């Protein structure tokens, strides 16, 4: 696999109130091309939108790929790279025996990741990373649309 086969993705979630109306956005770059994705939910949380952005971006790819996935959510990155094995081993319970929040999204995200080779990168949000800023703008667009603003 060459560098031109590499796909780079930035994802972000947004929520107006938490919970409240929210949106998700993703920027996908490959071989000189770009694709923007976004959507929203009228009643959600920021974490759910962060997770949805990753799921939607990965599910938009039509073949197994080598991906650099840039996220500004340590919740998403750590959840999939550190915590999920323990949650599954413990019957989807946290270390303090409480049910894992957003279990259905964790399961969907894990499934979406299976066919890809992913390098997870945490980027600081609102700090000038061009891809992250674009994903943030898309997430805000998704939020605005579910709130009835265009």
From Swiss-Prot:
It catalyses: Endonucleolytic cleavage to 5'-phosphomonoester. Coiled coil: none annotated. It is an enzyme of class 3 (hydrolase). CDD domains: RNase_HI_prokaryote_like (cd09278). Binds 1 Mg(2+) ion per subunit. May bind a second metal ion at a regulatory site, or after substrate binding. InterPro entries: RNase_H, RNaseH-like_sf, RNaseH_domain, RNaseH_sf, RNaseHI. It is found in: Cytoplasm. Its cofactor is Mg(2+). This is Ribonuclease H. GO terms for molecular function: magnesium ion binding; nucleic acid binding; RNA-DNA hybrid ribonuclease activity. Its EC number is 3.1.26.4. Belongs to the RNase H family. It comes from the Bacteria. Residues 129-150 are annotated as: Disordered. GO terms for biological process: DNA replication, removal of RNA primer. It holds the Pfam family RNase_H. Mg(2+) 2 binds at residues 12, 136. Mg(2+) 1 binds at residues 12, 50, 72. Monomer. GO terms for cellular component: cytoplasm. Its main location: cytoplasm. Keywords: Cytoplasm, Endonuclease, Hydrolase, Magnesium, Metal-binding, Nuclease. Residues 3-144 form the RNase H type-1 domain.
């Amino acid at each position: 696999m060459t560098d031109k086969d590499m796909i780079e993705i930035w994802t972000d979630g947004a929520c107006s109130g938490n919970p409240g109306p929210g949106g998700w956005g993703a920027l996908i770059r490959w071989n000189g091309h770009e694709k923007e994705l976004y959507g929203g939910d009228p009643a959600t949380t920021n974490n759910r939108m962060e997770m949805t952005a990753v799921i939607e971006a990965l599910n938009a790819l039509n073949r197994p790929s080598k991906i650099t996935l840039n996220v500004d959510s340590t919740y998403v990155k750590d959840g999939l790279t550190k915590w999920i094995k323990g949650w599954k081993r413990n019957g989807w319970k946290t270390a303090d025996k409480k049910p894992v929040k957003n279990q259905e999204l964790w399961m969907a995200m894990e499934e979406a990741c299976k066919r890809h080779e992913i390098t997870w990168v945490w980027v600081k949000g609102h700090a000038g990373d061009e891809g992250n800023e674009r994903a943030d703008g898309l997430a805000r667009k998704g939020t605005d649309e579910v709130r009835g603003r265009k």
